[in-house]
Swiss-Prot record:
PANTHER family attached to this UniProt entry: INNER MEMBRANE PROTEIN YHJD (PTHR30213), UPF0761 MEMBRANE PROTEIN YIHY (PTHR30213:SF0)
Segments passing through the bilayer: 44-64, 104-124, 140-160, 183-203, 210-230, 244-264
Pfam families per record: Virul_fac_BrkB (PF03631)
Protein name, entry field: UPF0761 membrane protein CKO_03126
Subcellular localization(s) per the UniProt record: Cell inner membrane
Keywords (A to Z) from UniProt: Cell inner membrane, Cell membrane, Membrane, Transmembrane, Transmembrane helix
GO terms under cellular component: plasma membrane
InterPro entries xref list: UPF0761_bac, Virul_fac_BrkB
Membrane as UniProt keyword: yes
HAMAP family per UniProt: UPF0761
Protein family (similarity comment): Belongs to the UPF0761 family.
Amino acid sequence: MLKNVHQKARHHTRPVRAWLKLLWQRIDEDNMTTLAGNLAYVSLLSLVPLIAVVFALFAAFPMFSDVSLQLRHFIFANFIPATGDVIQRYIEQFVANSNKMTAVGACGLIVTALLLMYAIDSALNTIWRSKRTRPKVYSFAVYWMILTLGPLLAGASLAISSYLLSLRWASELNTVIDNVLRVFPLILSWISFWLLYSIVPTTRVPNRDAVVGAFVAAVLFEAGKKGFALYITMFPSYQLIYGVLAVIPILFVWVYWTWCIVLLGAEITVTLGEYRKLKQAAEQEEADQS
């Protein structure tokens, strides 16, 4: 009896085990951790230029002045765990210094920010193993659109949320609003990863695969934030060793961990489609033989 149950369980879990084996094989072949390290390095170099460009765009639109503060607080509170306040102070100092740069220096900041997007594009197309290339002008237009419209849309959504919260009728829905706001970072991460996996690759990505991969990445990202914050709180070895400089290795590790999650979601998205094709090919071969 137990043997039959065990055999049935193995039979039902065989597709899952085969998919996990394929996923591990792709992660190994694509050198996912190395790609994550490369992106982490480029991200750390581009972090200040990217933030400087984003908030310079907000400064160009006076109506977004209040939203800029809300967006800044939201980013550091929800995307950088535990040490967000310290990192925010340093980055704001760097951004303030960058505002004193000349036009040539400002162009350099924009180019550096665009290089990060190019690195992300290259890494994801490596995972999708797509050899198709977009025209340079088209790629630049897409990167520039993301760089300009992305922050403005995020700011607009925060402004709308603040307006709705200020309405009298909304005060009666405090419990519902609190619950929605509690899962809002997860939903925002899910949508962001879905757009990343759907738009950036130069090959067609099935929407359902992108949704699943983005959801896994979003859950891991939110869990990673809480786990990382808990680790820093419970095991403050970095503070003991590095002292006031502890924020530097903490930021390095967090950025690397974030890119590992992003690329893992991409690998899951790719593997879902590849496994489905392999399964269909095997079924077709069995049908031909019979």
